[in-house]
Amino acid sequence: MRTRILTLLLLLFAFIANAQSTYVRLVTNRGNITLLLYDETPKHRHMFVQTIKKGLYNNAQFNRVIKSFVSQGGELDETILDREKQHPEIPIQRLAAEIKPNLFHKKGALGAGRNDNPEKSSYLTQMYLVVGKPQTDEQLDALEKKKGIKFSSSQRNTYKTTGGTPHLDNDYTVFGEVVEGMEVADAINSVKTDKNDLPLEPVTFKPVILSKKQAAKFKAIKH
């Protein structure tokens, strides 16, 4: 009887955890990318959902694309900082970092952009998708020594095979990942850019929050 009750409770907890998962589709002019927003970073998840609902990402562009590194979208640093400079009466808005050791910059990771600040707090309207490249043990060893961090064996394997940008770990908040459409993210990361990393042809995107029915196909995916 106890075993049966325990099994039912575990199933209930699993159902609740899945029900809380949030998925967002980036509808781009190069194809669609589906993202899972992590439950472990609730403030960033909520922030991204709210900015989408407010339309702050409507007509957004990937405006900083660096091949084999990241594709950054939303507002540029210069736009945000200039607005803050021109309107000192408006309090500067940042989101406290939610940096977790198990949420790392593997290929497909969704991160929050930021300026150089000691709190590592995030912008509200800037995100990036990691493409990166495979790393060697020597490179990872050097990063561990330089940054005072430790990569798990699983993280090492991911960085050595799939790739990513491990030098960003422990400095920027990772709050989601690509679960569908990585080939689109790769294509965007390969577009031609000018000297400022701006795509020569605009790459636009609009985030759309998926309904429970639309998200159901992704429920079995674990990061």
Describe the predicted segments one by one.
Residues M1-I5:
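Positively charged n-region of N-terminal signal peptides that target proteins for export
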Residues L6-L11, L168:
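Residues at the start of alpha-helices and the adjacent loop-to-helix junctions
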Residues L10-A19:
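Hydrophobic h-region of N-terminal signal peptides that target proteins for export
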Residues N18-H223:
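Cyclophilin-like peptidyl-prolyl cis-trans isomerases
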